[in-house]
């Protein structure tokens, strides 16, 4: 079987981590850079990362915030991500591009190759610059009607109608 390489980019509030993985999930190479917290600077960083690699079979992004139809909404701890659609931006590369919430990506990765391998029902919680999570039920990633099921960063912390105390905005494992 021919080895195919994929670029995986983890967008975080502190760092952007990236790796080349083969189709078996083995890391071929990886690195990280400090996150820039404005849209223009951030997109320049992503452009430079992608420009390093040729012959990719696909690119996967995981990011905080709501992700629906490969578009990031709200951006969680990185609000400047709101509205970014990597498929539109990198369409000329002619490779599949996937975008997923970072908490959901963590549970999928653990279920594929990690400590939750092959479990039909499992959950993961991520602690970083923000909080995140994902849930797998009956072997399927739980998405929900608003594409945010299992993302603990969007959990309300009070019963007020308007709640500015949402877990992902108020708490950070980095700050603990």
Model regions: which residues?
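Glycine-rich phosphate-binding loop and adjoining helix at the ATP-binding site
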Residues: 36-47, 55-59, 65-121, 162
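Active-site glycine-centered loops adjacent to acidic/histidine catalytic or metal-binding residues
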Residues: 10, 102, 128
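Conserved phosphate-binding loops in N-terminal lobes of ATP-dependent enzymes
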Residues: 2-63
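Residue-level detector of high-confidence beta-strand sites
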Residues: 30-32, 75, 144
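Glycine/GP-enriched mid-protein hinge/lid loop-to-helix segment characteristic of carbohydrate kinases
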Residues: 19-23, 39, 98, 113-176
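Hydrophobic "anchor" residues
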Residues: 27, 72, 141-142
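Short glycine-rich anion-binding loops that position phosphate/pyrophosphate groups of nucleotides
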Residues: 64-67, 128-130
